[in-house]
Amino acid sequence: MTTFEIECIESTREGLRDHYSKFCLEPLNQGQGTTLGNALRRTLLADLEGTAIVAVRIAGVSHEFSTIPGIREDVLEILLNLKEVVLKSQIGTSGVGRLRVQGPAIVTTNHLELPSEIELIDPNQYIATICGNNILEMEFRIETGKGYNLVERDSDESSIDFLQVDAIFMPVKKVNYLSKDIRSENNLIQEQLTLEVWTNGSIDPQDAVSQAGKILTELLFPLKEINFKPDDSESIIEDSKINQILIEELQLSVRAYNCLKRAQIHSVADLLDYSQEDLIEIKNFGQKSAEEVIDALQKRLGINLPKEKTSKSN
């Protein structure tokens, strides 16, 4: 089995909300580069948890197409700005934040009052501009999730003046990968995987790749030891075939065979209705014939008749 190494060959930060790293994974067997690259890309984009504002209640506002006196932006623009706010939850739970600013002022994320367990990544993100002495007051809900959460228009939150936001939980903004052939020291053709990861600053690309690897490992671990349950249908078919076997196949003595026939026992299925005690009580059968039948069933078909007497009478 090939053991590969991973190395971060480039890492930059162009801002508080734009982290980038480039990784190299090698050596891989042929075909593994695309397999691993695609799995990591999907996991990085879809399965990592992030934190975002999901709903906002603004004082004096009833719907997202409203305007607020003294505020340069309309409500829809404010919601779009709040959608871009990057947060990080230390314990992965939801919370409630607030904002109250009196103008004139330029409102940024630095004005947000957040729960202690939630961290603001960029305090300079723009939210709105207040003209004059007007007040912008709002309350917003913060949640942790995965992927992209579309607004549910019929949610109960609309009844209490909360305006929902299309929340972007994804801490990873973009992933690229490239697989190419390389030659080993033994002149074997192997593969090198290059992985590029961009994040929003709430997580380092290195940590993101590490989390993605852990998620994939936990996902695939059950496949390491697979214990398939037997197919019940196959067992039923096998039992059906055995039950259809005629008593002629048991190669019994003439006496035992004739006694069974007179008792209307023509197949193994008929015999299974009897216990060992029931066989002895068949007319003219006796202990010796019963033992012969019991022995034939056990040796030829692996069937053991119960010893106790059943309710069947002959």
Swiss-Prot record:
Region (Alpha N-terminal domain (alpha-NTD)) location: 1-227
Keyword Heme carried by entry: no
UniProt signal peptide: none
EC number(s) per entry: 2.7.7.6
Stored CDD domains: RNAP_alpha_NTD
Catalytic activity: RNA(n) + a ribonucleoside 5'-triphosphate = RNA(n+1) + diphosphate
Record-linked HAMAP family: RNApol_bact_RpoA
Domain remarks: The N-terminal domain is essential for RNAP assembly and basal transcription, whereas the C-terminal domain is involved in interaction with transcriptional regulators and with upstream promoter elements.
Protein's name in the database: DNA-directed RNA polymerase subunit alpha
Species of the source: Pyrenomonas salina
